[in-house]
Curated annotation (Swiss-Prot):
This is Protein 6b. Residues 162-182 are annotated as: Disordered. Involved in tumor formation and increases auxin and cytokinin effects in host plants. InterPro entries: Glycosidase. Transmembrane segments: none annotated. Keywords: Crown gall tumor, Plasmid. The keyword Acetylation does not apply. The gene is 6b.
Amino acid sequence: MAVPRWAVRDLTQISSARELSLRLEQARNDFRATVGSICYFNASARTPGQFDDEYIMTDQSLTYVYADGVTAQSCAMNRLLPSSSSNFGAAATAIPPWLLDPPRLNRLLREGTDEGGLVNYYEGPHKNAFFLAIMRSCIFVRPGADEINGVSYDFFARSGNYTEQAEEEEEEEEEEEEEEVLDREFQLGNLVSYPIIAWGSCPNSA
């Protein structure tokens, strides 16, 4: 089913790692109970009333997209996913927000991204002081993993943020009206409509 009016959980006032873990798990369970086992969320540009091919299977653990406070708040309020690299759009990781201090997390995030995204981790640890908790859609890929204290944490990437789709559709010379829609999507490539389950600040950033 499509995402109804899911209220993004604001966890910015929680400083305890244990409480944050519990609240995130509750948000994950509530999200699945609200939307069901499969979730379509982007309206089709071609077929009114239908959805595109991107979907989320909700029987999965949370993944985290890290950002600065202003970007995280804006994305949470508007249900948007920010890009963090020019080569594949949005980067996400299974590393939970309480596990590492900001400088160490920043070093790991820089290893999997470049300086071309809306969120540029190369500007410093403040760029990963907040998080967006999400579930991965079907177009996320797993390019690698990070090992921390003997535990492997997967690193994921969402390809393109509509940039590749827009280029392909232009090459196919679609009708003028459709091209205008795709042009707008191309210009908004650093942000893509996406279900955000919760957002907050990293306890070690306080």
